[in-house]
Curated annotation (Swiss-Prot):
Lineage, uppermost ranks: Bacteria, Bacillati, Bacillota, Clostridia, Eubacteriales
Record bears the keyword Ion transport: no
Family of the protein in this entry: Belongs to the thiamine-phosphate synthase family.
E.C. code: 2.5.1.3
Summary of the function given for this chain in its UniProt record: Condenses 4-methyl-5-(beta-hydroxyethyl)thiazole monophosphate (THZ-P) and 2-methyl-4-amino-5-hydroxymethyl pyrimidine pyrophosphate (HMP-PP) to form thiamine monophosphate (TMP).
Reactions listed under catalytic activity: 2-[(2R,5Z)-2-carboxy-4-methylthiazol-5(2H)-ylidene]ethyl phosphate + 4-amino-2-methyl-5-(diphosphooxymethyl)pyrimidine + 2 H(+) = thiamine phosphate + CO2 + diphosphate; 2-(2-carboxy-4-methylthiazol-5-yl)ethyl phosphate + 4-amino-2-methyl-5-(diphosphooxymethyl)pyrimidine + 2 H(+) = thiamine phosphate + CO2 + diphosphate; 4-methyl-5-(2-phosphooxyethyl)-thiazole + 4-amino-2-methyl-5-(diphosphooxymethyl)pyrimidine + H(+) = thiamine phosphate + diphosphate
GO biological process terms held by the UniProt record: thiamine biosynthetic process; thiamine diphosphate biosynthetic process
GO terms assigned for molecular function: magnesium ion binding; thiamine-phosphate diphosphorylase activity
Enzyme class: transferase
Name of the protein in question: Thiamine-phosphate synthase
Binding site residues for 2-[(2R,5Z)-2-carboxy-4-methylthiazol-5(2H)-ylidene]ethyl phosphate: 142-144, 173, 193-194
CDD domains (UniProt xref): TMP_TenI (cd00564)
Amino acid sequence: MVRRRGLSGLLEADIYGITAWEYSLGRSNIEVVAQMIEAGIKVIQYREKERPARQKYEECLKIREMTREAGVTFIVNDHVDLALLVDADGVHLGQDDLPADRVRELVGDKMIIGLSTHSPAQARAAEKMGVDYIGVGPIFATKTKKDVCDPVGLEYLEFVVKNISLPFVAIGGIKEHNIAEVSSRGAKCIALVTEIVGAEDIKAKVRALRAIISRKED
């Protein structure tokens, strides 16, 4: 069995960080990622839809260097070419991106492939595609993705917990005030975007989120 590089970090992660420059209070993605790493986040995804390709490449090169040094799993959203160029640990695909099985042909056996899902049918299909994990959401309404579907709610999360064998990351509109609902439904790894990148003190925010998660696990 092939062991994907960085997969252990993903499987052990409680919080999954995602970049979003426009919500980062004027800080660069490099500054935010540095603070995420300092806060102990073990998986970081680079997701920037609107930036020029060259800028994405340069940012990802630096983030790859930072995450590798810190032992943090680094995922690139959507762009398989970018993930390959910077030697990322993985790539995360949407339902309208390249088919996961064809991406596997491109990236080989050692790269993690994640896939966003929004319904039971998509989750069941993902189990047959050879992806390593799925995104489950959006759980709640979110402003960071303009083309996203309506919230799927906690019901879909509960379906995945009970019926799907793949590791998963809960995502979409998750904040400090509702993360307990997500954690208590069985989500072990939770992605937050604006709640983390938009925090003045990222380390303190992550500490507060973890305190809530740990209370729900007790």
